Amino acid sequence: MYKRQLDGAQPQWGVASADVLVEGVTEGSTAGLTAIFADVDSISKVGPVGAGRDLFLQVALPLNAVPVSIDKNIYASNLLNTLGYQDLDGYHIGKAAFAFDQGRQDAGYREENCWYTTGELIRTGLTNYGASAEGDNTPLFRFGTRPEVNPENRNGMNLTVTFSKTDSEQLNYNTGTGLYEKLNADGSPMTDADNGQQVGFTNVFVLYASSGIKDDGYTRQYDMTGGTGLYLQGGAWEQINWTKEDATGPFTLTDADGAPLTVAPGKSFIAIWGGYYGQGLTLTAADGSEQTLPEKPVLLESGVSDEAAAAAEEELSAAQRIIDAQAAVDQAKADLADALDELQEAQTACDADSENADLLAVRDAVQAKIDELNQTIADNQAILDAAAPEETPPPEEEQPAESEAETPAE
């Protein structure tokens, strides 16, 4: 189940009831999110439903899951078509499997953030395709009993996953519930719009994956064949390794020594993390000490180096500063014309009643406003002048050479 993540999509339905949440950047700077449910009948309401992406398909397909989305990009479409895998896409099946929350729109939410589905609607949609939700689920992990973590060994209490400079999210361990409680990028608790419950997980994974850019020059490409990573549970963390054969192959997780990783039963959060420019990870222990984490993954050949990304970011920022400065100058000049008219009116009133303190205060306030506008113009004009290309001086005219006839005789 792909969920919309952009501004205006929160709170989302079904995030607390999902068995697994998977998050990672597929394009732009905001991480995409998908929810995985073990039982379709456990889905009371989930959404707002977003567009499908192939990164999340590679997590869901090995589980024999039904991908549910409204539209999808070309890479997700190509993958499903190649495999002959039936999904449920609202772009094609419409209201047979999806519904619109009018009350949410009436509350001010955009239309695209009001579409949802339910377990019953999913079953109806699959029936329209002659498909069924019945079938065996493939376990995502090797579940089993893990040793209890002693308080003095809680070295993985607070995790910050920075997906971009504008999308940094936290998972904090609650010793009372034994869950990692998730916060939104703005620091607010991530809650379920269906029941108001805060989203929490028994297990948290950060899977390192080398990344680059696909051939459209925009969509993120990840090497999903394997890498290192982090596993957090019970307030402690350990380094792990993971492998995956292909798009339909399951994850194989091992501990640092290569032994199969035993995962505690419960809900799980998985972050796909490329470690490219603008991304970061911070993990602290119960005493606040920052942990030393594995080195970030190397870039794919199509990836952009940190140096090149920083240079491009600075170039973009410089261009934006010029745009902002010009807009500020234009606006200040327009406001200045009005302010000068106000000053003239205020001065005329003062001339007629020079002892009136209220009129003098109005005049002084207008003058202060004019001074502020002039300063705004000066400050932003300085930015424009500094960015303007230097004028090339005109070439010097060549002096004609003296002829031998004009050379005086000795």
Where on the chain are the PLM-derived regions?
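Low-complexity/repetitive intrinsically disordered segments
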Residues: 1-2, 410
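A surface/extracellular/periplasmic glyco- and lipid-processing/surface-interacting theme
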Residues: 4-20, 27-306
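Hydrophobic, Leu/Ile/Phe/Ala-enriched alpha-helical segments that form helix-helix packing faces
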Residues: 25, 80, 404-406
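Extended amphipathic alpha-helical heptad-repeat regions
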Residues: 304-410
